[in-house]
Structure formats: structure tokens, C-alpha cells
Amino acid sequence: MQLNDLKPAKGARHQKLRVGRGIGSGKGKTAGRGHKGQHSRAGGYHKVGFEGGQMPLQRRVPKFGFTSRKELISAEVRLGELNKISGDVVDLASLKAANIISRQIKRVKIFAAGKLEKPVTIRGLRVTKGVKAAIEAAGGKIE
């Protein structure tokens, strides 16, 4: 087999259905749209979500919850990602410099996922119990 011989598997691609091309085709005359009515005509169709005057689903069900504004400036960082930081001090600035978090982030929590391979000092960041134990086991500290 050569690159110029490549082709899709048999039955993987379907021929486009050509409608309105004579009665012998099986899809001539009305082209699968039936006779008369709104659906047979060009342009007009139903409004999205309209249920014929019945109260639509999106208005029947109650509203709930809200979007927390804290979530926009918060991030979670895996413990294993701290290995990417060149220095031994981990704070917001060093995480941004290492491209681990985006610039608008102001709150960070480190959670235990991955392995820490060097002792680090955590400054001004929240950590889980597992991370605290892992950092102290690696010879680092949390300030």
C-alpha cells in the first residue's frame, strides 16, 4: 500500500442524497418534505424551544444556583506541577512565571496529585492535609 492508494473503508462514507431529481429517484417532486404546510415550504420553521403555546420546558423548571465570582480568580494546582518551578519558593508570582496558572488568578490551593521531587517552601497558598504531609516529608515547609 502506498500513500496514493489510501481511501476510506467500504461503507464508511455515504453518498450525498440528491433530492428533487425526478420521480424515479424515490426522492423527486416533494423531495421528502410531504405535501403543503409550513414544513414543505422554504424559510419558515418552528422557533427553538416553542411548544405550540404550552409553557416551554426552560420556563417550567425553576431557576437555581449562581456563578461564583471567586471561581473566576481561583485555581487548583497539582502537587506534581511544583516540580516545574525553578526556584525553591512557591508563591503566586512563581506559579504565574512558570505558566502553571493564568495572570488573573489570585487564590490557589495545592492538592495531592503527583510526586514532589525536591524540597520547596510554600508562601501564601492554601494546601490540603496530604500536600502538607508530602511537603514536610520532602524536607520543605509551609509559611
UniProtKB/Swiss-Prot annotation:
<dbReference type="GO" id="GO:0003735">
    <property type="term" value="F:structural constituent of ribosome"/>
</dbReference>
<comment type="similarity">
    <text>Belongs to the universal ribosomal protein uL15 family.</text>
</comment>
<keyword id="KW-0687">Ribonucleoprotein</keyword>
<dbReference type="Pfam" id="PF00828">
    <property type="entry name" value="Ribosomal_L27A"/>
</dbReference>
<keyword id="KW-0699">rRNA-binding</keyword>
<dbReference type="GO" id="GO:0006412">
    <property type="term" value="P:translation"/>
</dbReference>
<protein>
    <recommendedName>
        <fullName>Large ribosomal subunit protein uL15</fullName>
    </recommendedName>
</protein>
<comment type="subunit">
    <text>Part of the 50S ribosomal subunit.</text>
</comment>
<dbReference type="GO" id="GO:0019843">
    <property type="term" value="F:rRNA binding"/>
</dbReference>
<dbReference type="InterPro" id="IPR030878">
    <property type="entry name" value="Ribosomal_uL15"/>
</dbReference>
<dbReference type="InterPro" id="IPR021131">
    <property type="entry name" value="Ribosomal_uL15/eL18"/>
</dbReference>
<dbReference type="GO" id="GO:0022625">
    <property type="term" value="C:cytosolic large ribosomal subunit"/>
</dbReference>
<dbReference type="InterPro" id="IPR036227">
    <property type="entry name" value="Ribosomal_uL15/eL18_sf"/>
</dbReference>
<comment type="function">
    <text>Binds to the 23S rRNA.</text>
</comment>
<keyword id="KW-0689">Ribosomal protein</keyword>
<feature type="region of interest" description="Disordered">
    <location>
        <begin position="20"/>
        <end position="52"/>
    </location>
</feature>
<feature type="compositionally biased region" description="Basic residues">
    <location>
        <begin position="30"/>
        <end position="39"/>
    </location>
</feature>
<keyword id="KW-0694">RNA-binding</keyword>
<dbReference type="InterPro" id="IPR005749">
    <property type="entry name" value="Ribosomal_uL15_bac-type"/>
</dbReference>
